[in-house]
Amino acid sequence: MIGAVLAGGKSRRFGEDKLLFEINGKPLVLHTIERLEGCSSIKKVIIVASPQNREAMEEFGYEVVVDDLTIGPISGVYSALSLGDAFVVGGDMPSLIPEFIDYIIKQFNNSGKIACVPRWSNGYLEPLHAAYSKNFRDILEERIEKGLYKLGDAISSAKNVCYIKIEDLPLGWRESFFNVNKKEDLHRIMQ
C-alpha cells in the first residue's frame, strides 16, 4: 500500500509553512514520513503537494503528486488515489504510531471495504489517518463535481466503509492523531 502524505495546506494558524519548519534539525514533514516508513504495510511513500509547494516537497527525494484542485483534504486524497490504494495522513502528524497504521491497513485488507477509518464514539472521524481503496476515488470525484468538499461527509455517504472504534484500541495509539497547528503545539515533539 502507498503511504500518502498530504502537504498542500496553507498553515494559516502556524504563520509560515509548518511542514518545512525544522524540529530537532529536520523539517516537520520528514518526521511524518519517517514514521510512515516504519510501517511494514507501507511499500512506498509519496507526497501530495499543492502547485505552490511542489518544488519544496520535491527537494526531499520522494515522488510528488500535485493536487491541482487544492480544495482541501478531499482533493489531496483524490490525487493520492490516482496511484492506487493509499493510507493517507497529514504532513503535520509527527507522532504517527506505525503499529496502529499497520493495524488499520490489516483491517482494511481483511474487510474488502472501500475505506477503513478510525471513528470516535461521538461519530467524529479521523479521515487523515485512514486507508482508502483506489475505488473510493470515484465517490470523491462525484462529490467534487457537485461542489461537496468535506472529506468526512464523503466517507459517511459511502455505504461500504470499515470503521475502527477508537475507544477499543490501546490508549497510547491516540497520540498518532496529533497534528501541529500552531507553534505552541511543537513543545509536544521537541522534548
UniProtKB/Swiss-Prot annotation:
Superkingdom in the source lineage: Archaea
Reactions it catalyzes: Mo-molybdopterin + GTP + H(+) = Mo-molybdopterin guanine dinucleotide + diphosphate
A Gene Ontology cellular-component term: cytoplasm
SUPFAM superfamilies: Nucleotide-diphospho-sugar transferases
Keyword Transferase: yes
Enzyme Commission code(s) on record: 2.7.7.77
Coiled coil: none
Enzyme class of the recorded protein, top EC level: transferase
GO molecular function terms listed in the Swiss-Prot or TrEMBL record: GTP binding; metal ion binding; molybdenum cofactor guanylyltransferase activity
Cell compartments where the protein resides: Cytoplasm
Binding-site residues for Mg(2+), renumbered to this chain: 92
Cofactor(s) this protein requires: Mg(2+)
UniProt keyword list: Cytoplasm, GTP-binding, Magnesium, Metal-binding, Molybdenum cofactor biosynthesis, Nucleotide-binding, Transferase
A GO biological-process term: Mo-molybdopterin cofactor biosynthetic process
Residues given in the record as GTP binding sites: 6-8, 18, 67, 92
Protein task: Transfers a GMP moiety from GTP to Mo-molybdopterin (Mo-MPT) cofactor (Moco or molybdenum cofactor) to form Mo-molybdopterin guanine dinucleotide (Mo-MGD) cofactor.
Similarity field: Belongs to the MobA family.
Domain characteristics, as noted in the entry: The N-terminal domain determines nucleotide recognition and specific binding, while the C-terminal domain determines the specific binding to the target protein.
Protein name, per record: Probable molybdenum cofactor guanylyltransferase
Organism: Pyrococcus abyssi (strain GE5 / Orsay)
